[in-house]
Design a protein with these regions (language model features):
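Glycine-rich phosphate-binding loop and adjacent beta-alpha segment
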Residues: 223-296
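Short glycine/proline-centered loop/turn elements that form peptide/ligand docking sites
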Residues: 74-75, 174-184, 223-224, 244-247
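NAD(P)H dinucleotide-binding glycine-rich loop of Rossmann-like/cofactor-binding domains
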Residues: 88-152
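Mid-domain Rossmann-like dinucleotide-binding core that forms the NAD(H)/NADP(H) cofactor-binding site
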Residues: 123-198
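Short amphipathic alpha-helix with an adjacent loop that forms part of the alpha/beta core around
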Residues: 200-210
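Glycine-rich beta-strand-centered segment in the early N-terminal region that forms part
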Residues: 22-38, 50-91
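Residue-level marker of beta-strand positions
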Residues: 83-84, 102, 147, 167, ...
């Protein structure tokens, strides 16, 4: 099969189109003929810096995929040849990823592709959907009626997070830049929109929320993470996707008694946590129902 192979860490030219043997399947695995693969910032970071398993090079990147089941083992119970699936699996240095004609996945970690999405749309959804879902519902303790700050609301994770928060009955303030992104997040249901290039988001959020958001979701990191501590209520939640720098000043978080959580949806893959990967597949099934009901969309 054809695959885009990462031969070393470096610039884009380390990605080379090569012929690889067709993968075999065992246990409850599916062989999926990929129709589309997602491209995310994590893919470019792994390509530039190296994968989580540098000893297993060369590697096939790509976490997200959507396609048709080409073959299934006799032990597979949920899918058969011809079924359309989507998933987030592999591509971080251990299990081969989705930058290939075929991918192998344990059927327990896959979900039926939402009928309302094209294969390209479905392949763009798993990582951002799981990330936003876990960040809000599992790390951030999201409750109906809360006021939630979501940074970079027009981004991949951000635009899904806005919709999930609104579906759960929360009010949303989000940061963006420019007219086009403002229109997008308004259309997604954001209640408060702050152009961070023209206004101080800390002051804007404190004014909108009456003293601080109940929950803040940081998808940017750095100085934004630091400043966000100043617009969360006492005993509120701050969830971040990024690792804070060594120069982070935690004083405000401590004084406000914030609960700071980290969201990395790759953890189950990194450590082989089967139950957690099955849970993520359930998130894809629940998200798929929202897509098909017209309550959630991927941009």
């Amino acid at each position: 099969m054809k695959a885009v192979v990462m031969t070393a860490a470096g610039k884009p030219d380390v990605l080379q189109l090569q012929d690889l043997p067709m993968p075999a399947i065992q246990g409850r695995e599916l062989l999926v003929r990929l129709k589309a693969a997602g491209v995310h910032p994590v893919d470019t970071k792994l390509r530039a810096r190296g994968t989580y398993c540098p000893e297993r090079m060369p590697a096939v990147l790509g976490c997200d995929g959507a396609g048709i089941v080409e073959a299934a083992t006799p032990q597979a119970q949920n899918f058969k040849s011809g079924d359309a699936v989507y998933f987030c699996n592999g591509g971080i240095g251990g299990h081969p990823g989705t930058y290939a004609e075929f991918a192998v996945i344990d059927e327990r970690f896959a979900a039926a592709k939402p009928a309302s999405l094209s294969f390209a749309e479905a392949a763009a959804a798993p990582l951002v959907l799981i990330t936003a879902w876990e960040a809000l519902h599992e790390r951030g303790r999201l409750q109906a009626g809360q006021r939630v700050l979501i940074h970079a609301g027009a981004g991949g994770v951000g635009h899904v997070a806005i919709q999930l928060a609104r579906l759960h009955g929360a009010q949303v303030c989000t940061t963006v830049s420019g007219i086009e992104k403002t229109r997008l997040v308004r259309d997604l249901g954001a209640d408060c929109i702050v152009d961070y290039r023209a206004a101080d988001f800390v002051a804007a959020v404190n004014d909108w929320s009456g003293g601080g958001a109940d929950l803040a979701f940081d998808t940017v990191g750095g100085a934004i993470f630091q400043r966000t501590m100043h617009c969360i209520r006492h005993y509120g939640d701050l969830v971040t996707l990024l690792q804070p720098g060594n120069d982070t000043d935690w004083k405000e978080a401590r004084l406000r008694n914030l609960r700071v959580s980290f969201e990395l949806m790759l953890t189950p893959m990194l450590y082989g946590l089967d139950a957690a990967q099955r849970h993520q597949a359930d998130i894809l099934r629940r998200g798929g129902a929202l897509f098909d009901a017209g309550k959630l969309r991927i941009h």
